[in-house]
């Protein structure tokens, strides 16, 4: 029983890669906005405190370089998302049951909420959860027989 639970958890992690990568992209986008905001601030803090001996004279340049680096990471992450979705689609469509395929597709490839998954599949949320659980079991079996695909 425990091995089955571990297999199902590994299958869920495998299927959830695009969603995790998308959250990482959103975090990086927020960081870029914050960095650009810091870089373009023109107000100087007026204080009677002494200045440091070595002020960062390239503050704006440093912030913009960090933002550009994050933008490059986002492009690489988007490629990783697309690759993961292609792998997941191929694995999902290898499952025999059409309803399980549809639930897994809408949940993990389209990254839809449960209510949207149920609506797209024309069933109640509880029924979508049942198809999901069976689909994840079948995915775990496939992954255990073929060797677990590399998580990136």
Regions from the language model: what does each represent?
Residues 96-112:
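Short amphipathic alpha helix immediately N-terminal
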Residues 1-93, 116, 137, 141-152:
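N-terminal interaction/assembly modules
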Residues 81, 101, 125-129:
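Alpha-helix N-cap/helix-initiation sites
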Residues 92, 96-99, 127:
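Short coil/turn residues that cap or connect secondary-structure elements
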Residues 13, 112, 130:
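Short, well-structured alpha-helical interface segments that form or flank functional binding sites
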Residues 110-126:
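Helix-turn-helix DNA-binding module
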Residues 122-142:
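DNA-recognition helix of helix-turn-helix
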